[in-house]
């Protein structure tokens, strides 16, 4: 099922051509351009209080284009700022954390054209909206995906992997059950995993996950689900040990 906010294609047009995905790229590009213009309009029309944007300036853009696309367009715009424009280190660091593709031919069309102070304020509102969702990220991970074998561990799915409508902690936590991608030294990428919230079993790629969850952040509901999933294997291990002793 497609996202209600439309596709967000994060690779170059050249890559899209190679994989016969130009229609996806074209639609994503069109929406990115519309989003950038909507941000400019929201800033331009915002009621001013001491020259600051209204507290809900970003709301209409986020509701129409989604947080994921809005962050993508804003991050791209920060990276497109010339060296003579001094964005704060915090904003630059934030923009680096969001994958965008440098594009000298098409990127200028969805670069937000506004005063730096207003751009920073709009980014602040967008980040607040994102943070209010309470999603897991690298900060809650004890290990990365290339530190050790992750089979049998609870993995944190990257928000960028999920459709925005599925953004929730319940959809982020998966128990890795197998696949060559579990081994950081393995050549394969596939990881087979079970969703803790609903028991769905499916295949993902190693890069779809941020890392191994630090279990101090494991919610109570997830602890119960995890115990239920691990119980049969623990019982099998006990039975095997008993058989060995007999």
Outline where the language-model segments fall:
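Gram-negative host-targeted secretion-system effectors, predominantly Type III and Type IV
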Residues: 1-246
């Amino acid at each position: 099922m497609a996202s209600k906010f439309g596709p967000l294609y994060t690779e170059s047009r050249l890559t899209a051509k190679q994989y016969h995905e130009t229609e996806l790229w074209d639609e994503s590009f069109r929406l990115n351009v519309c989003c950038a213009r909507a941000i400019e309009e929201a800033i331009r029309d915002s009621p001013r209080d001491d020259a600051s944007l209204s507290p809900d300036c970003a709301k209409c853009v986020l509701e129409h284009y989604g947080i994921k696309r809005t962050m993508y367009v804003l991050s791209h715009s920060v990276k497109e700022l010339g060296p003579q424009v001094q964005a704060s280190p915090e904003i630059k660091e934030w923009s680096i954390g969001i994958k965008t593709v440098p594009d000298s031919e098409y990127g200028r069309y969805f670069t937000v054209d506004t005063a730096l102070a207003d751009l920073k304020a709009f980014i602040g509102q967008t980040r607040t909206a994102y943070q209010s969702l309470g999603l897991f990220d690298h900060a809650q991970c004890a290990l990365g995906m290339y530190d050790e074998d992750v089979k049998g561990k609870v993995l944190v799915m990257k928000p960028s992997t999920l459709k925005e409508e599925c953004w929730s902690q319940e959809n982020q936590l998966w128990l890795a059950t197998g696949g060559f991608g579990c081994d950081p030294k393995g050549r394969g990428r596939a990881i087979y995993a079970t969703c803790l919230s609903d028991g769905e079993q499916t295949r993902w790629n190693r890069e779809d996950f941020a890392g191994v969850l630090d279990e101090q952040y494991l919610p109570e509901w997830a602890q119960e689900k995890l115990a239920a999933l691990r119980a049969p294997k623990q019982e099998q291990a006990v039975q095997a040990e008993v058989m060995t002793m007999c």
